[in-house]
Amino acid sequence: MDWSTLGVVIVPPIAGGIIGYFTNDLAISMLFKPYRAIKIGDRRLPFTPGLIPRNQERLAQKVSDAIMTSLLTPEELQAIAQRLLQTERVQGAIFWLLQLALDQVKSDTGQRTAQILANILRDFADQSLPRIIVALARREDFLQDQLDQVFDQVLLDLQLTDDQAQQLANWIINVVVPPDTLRLLLIDFLTDRNIAILDRDLRTKTSGTYWLVANVMGVQSSLVKLRTFCIEEKLACNAIVAELLTSLGIRQRFVEWLASLSLQNLPVRTVRQLRQQFRESVRGYTQNKGISVLQNLGTSVDWDETAMLIVKRLQTSEVVTTSLKDISEDLALILERYLERDLEMIVVKALPILNLDQVIIDRVNHTAPEDLEAAIQGIVKTELQAIVILGGVLGIVIGLLQSLILLFS
């Protein structure tokens, strides 16, 4: 076999294999190169820049449409959101946020948290709370159970101590009804008409010794003399009245009566009426003066100091730290129930906000043609290497066929 025949047999398979193996790289390079338009004067050379750089905007739109219609559909995004928002993941995220907030509160040295809390408490006490209380006071059952409990457990058991009863009895004897007041009351009572009525009743309605005294001696003159004595002899009359109060033990009787005074001794019907009146009084007072009273009470409280105490308590409270897990679990369950109902609607509303198609278009448009070519070449070399090898094999096969044709021709 001479060299010409050997060349006919060997060269076509080798050339076909080389061409087939490097065709993919050559084709990809032809799609991208040249990267920029080549101009001679003011005229652009044909086929410059390459096919993809020249139509990069349209390619970006096609890529975006393909991804949004085939890959990132609303159903797929909803499935992704469901996987991301599983209860365990949501609970972990909420727990992390709560722990982060607690750490921030513990490390807060600028009193910022306390100031924010103080403003919230001040606004709530001055504005929101009074309006809420007054609105609730318009209801018939406003604090009914609570007020009944206060009445039954506090007011119903309220009773004066011995010292309080002694002080109140002294006040009654010395201030309310002193001897001079009793003297004046006696003078006002012993009018001529009352004296005549007493004299007539004693004469007609008594018997025995009292009848004899009333009819023989009479009481009219004695009562008139008593009235005259009270009017003319003030000091002596007051002394006699004071002596009578002492000898009769009126002060001690007042003490015993006041010490035994209690709402429990009243009839059940009266107690029920007092309970109802107590509720209505509190309700009416709240409706009329509740806003002003609560606002004045709110202004009298040092909310800055109160907020600081609360924050310090939170910083050292073990209950807050141990309850974060339970709180995060409850919040995660609430969020899960909400997402089960409204996740599809949320995804539909979120898609226009995310504007994923425009993000893809912008990303493709802002990617340099060199980077696109390198990315595609990398995919071909790593993921599509079998196609490259297949191209070389096909080139060798075609070269062998060509060699056979040349030999037999």
Swiss-Prot record:
<keyword id="KW-0997">Cell inner membrane</keyword>
<dbReference type="GO" id="GO:0005886">
    <property type="term" value="C:plasma membrane"/>
</dbReference>
<dbReference type="InterPro" id="IPR007383">
    <property type="entry name" value="DUF445"/>
</dbReference>
<protein>
    <recommendedName>
        <fullName>UPF0754 membrane protein AM1_5604</fullName>
    </recommendedName>
</protein>
<keyword id="KW-1133">Transmembrane helix</keyword>
<keyword id="KW-0812">Transmembrane</keyword>
<feature type="transmembrane region" description="Helical">
    <location>
        <begin position="387"/>
        <end position="407"/>
    </location>
</feature>
<dbReference type="InterPro" id="IPR016991">
    <property type="entry name" value="UCP032178"/>
</dbReference>
<comment type="similarity">
    <text>Belongs to the UPF0754 family.</text>
</comment>
<feature type="transmembrane region" description="Helical">
    <location>
        <begin position="3"/>
        <end position="23"/>
    </location>
</feature>
<dbReference type="Pfam" id="PF04286">
    <property type="entry name" value="DUF445"/>
</dbReference>
<keyword id="KW-1003">Cell membrane</keyword>
<keyword id="KW-0472">Membrane</keyword>
